[in-house]
Amino acid sequence: MPVLFKHTRPLFGVWKIEETSDELLSMLALRSEYLPFLQNIKTEKRRQEWLASRVLLKELSGSELLIAYHEDGAPYLPDSAYHLSISHTNGYAAVLLQEQPAAGIDIEYYSTRILKIRSRFMSPEEDASVDPDNAVKHLLVYWCAKEALFKMIRQQDVDFIEHLHIEPFTYADSRQIKAYETRTGDPQSYTLSYEVRPDFVFVYSLPSGSGILR
């Protein structure tokens, strides 16, 4: 199907993956560039995700851009001023394009497993803010926010409790939140935005200076 939804400022979109990998590949012109990579992807699900992110990037940017990877695995666009972030979850792909270097997006399908692993990524202060009536959704927002922040800072040996911090917030279906990191030598704070959809949660970074809208 086409883009599930698209946002222009910042520029991002979510694609619901209903096509086969062959169908997705047919939507791209630079097929010969992709085949060597696809041959190394063993599962159909991963091939679908890999291709869907490129089809979505084409839809967002208006042209077919090749994705390269830094040594740490972070994707980038060699011939573009945009900075790129990509995320996948069960049946969905998300792509974010921003002019600022620190760009991060994360999307997660609903799963109660988040309740079992909350102690691995939530600080006591963050955990105390979780709405018991919306615990799964609230925790998924925290998780996605920290995943997006992790992508933004591009550091190794990151502890999600010690180094990645989300200012506790009251749950709502969408809002902006504040995040900061203490892993780098020059800690930074960031503004993130999230949305809770019927099947998934996603969080994305906002341009510097966006501030918090209440």
Task: State what each model feature region is.
Residues 1-214:
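Core catalytic alpha/beta fold that binds nucleotide/phospho-ligands
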